[in-house]
């Protein structure tokens, strides 16, 4: 288990007198860490905590960003295994939290590749994040191309693919809308896992124009 406490550095009292009995930030964070570690006394959680982190986030966006990350306990990552491949997971890695259900989902997608006669087929994994899906498709495909706009995620994908011994994965950092105009390969199958705001309206016609049999 990797746990992150996210707080803001902004003063909630804004110069006013704090409510009597309220905790300062340091006391709150220490108490949070101690409470979690005390849970390890429960045999069900013994040895389960890989790390505990404190993230300071002053952004007003609806997603967590790190202005500062402090490691309170353990390490900043852990390893998860899916369908025989190992992935290094950190706080900001996008990874399915229910790994058992994820395996069923990913195996189904991999079976689609196999049904295409996958050994010489090309798969596009668009909005690929840290490349989890792309790498899981790689053993059944000739080549997998992942496209992701976040450069840090692309670097993580490359490292995980190398660690898994996969040499048929290519990860490209860039906007799907623009990258599709630059990639020469044509896909036999496309996997889409876009962010919350969905697929760019101008990218969708380009994806459809590939006229592939399977879009997952």
Give the residues covered by each predicted segment.
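Rossmann-like S-adenosyl-L-methionine
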Residues: 12-216
